[in-house]
Amino acid sequence: MATPAVPVSAPPATPAPVPAAAPVSAPASVPAPTPAPAAAPVPAAAPASSSDPAAAAATTAAPGQTPASAQAPAQTPAPALPGPALPGPFPGGRVVRLHPVILASIVDSYERRNEGAARVIGTLLGTVDKHSVEVTNCFSVPHNESEDEVAVDMEFAKNMYELHKKVSPNELILGWYATGHDITEHSVLIHEYYSREAPNPIHLTVDTSLQNGRMSIKAYVSTLMGVPGRTMGVMFTPLTVKYAYYDTERIGVDLIMKTCFSPNRVIGLSSDLQQVGGASARIQDALSTVLQYAEDVLSGKVSADNTVGRFLMSLVNQVPKIVPDDFETMLNSNINDLLMVTYLANLTQSQIALNEKLVNL
């Protein structure tokens, strides 16, 4: 079961700079449409196809910035069509549940980036629940970025998603990620592409440069802003980020956290007995904390909390009631079974070694 940690505080809404209108080449069989402002997202009902030349490698120019309140250009802009709202949490809860494997994959992609690349981007995969969006997987997407333009290999992104669907058919495209501490004008153009693949996509930023001394992780969703009939802008609204773990992921995270106290940042794998001992020590510390809290409540040092009391009562009721003699009998039986398995394994190993020597004679 995934156990969320303390939510990361969401920063205030960040208006993104909106680049100028970006022409995108259309397929040969379809006449080129009138250029529209880059801030107007494309409807989700028109995803990019493999036969579309623009989907192979999209190169979009972004020469300057246009404020969201700027006057309309000379030509009549295309009407802004907001994408459909992401089903589930975003009308209310606005919660993104992030698994640690996502962060590890993003950091690994950043460390392996091409020489001269300022940041890396990629696609976020996961599932949509009733009250939250759970990001469980991701993959990086090659792109080239300069001051004037950004080019994204959309065909590579589509092929990678098709491969992921064969392994995890329930995972959907939820949005995209980028390394860095801020949202650039090119982020609006990339976000427009992902609006075709997912309704109201998520934009996740991971500060791999550790600008504030820590790896800041933020999630946003885009919102159109402006006067109807004028050039529309985009505002990125922050979302609440929580961390979720599977049991296997939690073991890896606990092991990685131990490297914080190692001078060389390296730690070896512990044996099964050491893991059992560590788990027992953690349980003992937790029980000591619970007992101290109960004593403080009884002595009047701490006011009683009904929520904590109900939780402790539920925890106590889950403990099975076993007679000490029966428990000792079950423990001895399990120990005897373990000793028998160990004896048979050693006997089999000896027989195999003896057989090899007889064959070599």
Curated annotation (Swiss-Prot):
Gene designation per UniProt: EIF3F
Major enzyme class: hydrolase
Protein name from the UniProt record: Eukaryotic translation initiation factor 3 subunit F
Reaction equations catalysed: Thiol-dependent hydrolysis of ester, thioester, amide, peptide and isopeptide bonds formed by the C-terminal Gly of ubiquitin (a 76-residue protein attached to proteins as an intracellular targeting signal)
Swiss-Prot/TrEMBL keywords: Acetylation, Cytoplasm, Hydrolase, Initiation factor, Phosphoprotein, Protease, Protein biosynthesis, Thiol protease, Ubl conjugation pathway
PROSITE patterns with a match to the protein in the record: MPN
SMART domains named in the record: JAB_MPN (SM00232)
Region: Disordered, residue numbers: 1-86
